[in-house]
Amino acid sequence: MSEELYIAGSCNIGTREIMRRRIVALSGLIFALITASAVLSADSPKSARWAVFVPLLVAAIGWIQSRRKFCLAYGLAGTFNFGRMGEIKRVNDPISRNADRKTALTILLQSLALAFVLTLVFYFLPI
């Protein structure tokens, strides 16, 4: 296994944290599918299809974080973790913290966009 290393604005979580983000992504996707199924089977009004947005957002955030090896919350808080869960360390360099915040906001915007597009697709499905 390669050595895990904090890289400002690029990598702030290790293998365990990445696995945790994958679990969050899968959980969000499962909840989105359950929500979509419930909305469709209950013969709800079309506007109820927007209910999948939040679980899709959770899935998108988890998935993008796992792919980028970067935790949005840690980036905003100026922290990182490559050890056990809860062994969070502070980023001391202000330039690195700024780079982390920019990456965190980028991940948030990407996640919002992905969840919105997927929700729109579901909304306009002719079923």
Pin down the residues of each PLM region.
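Membrane-interfacial helix-loop segments of redox and metal-homeostasis proteins
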Residues: S2-I127
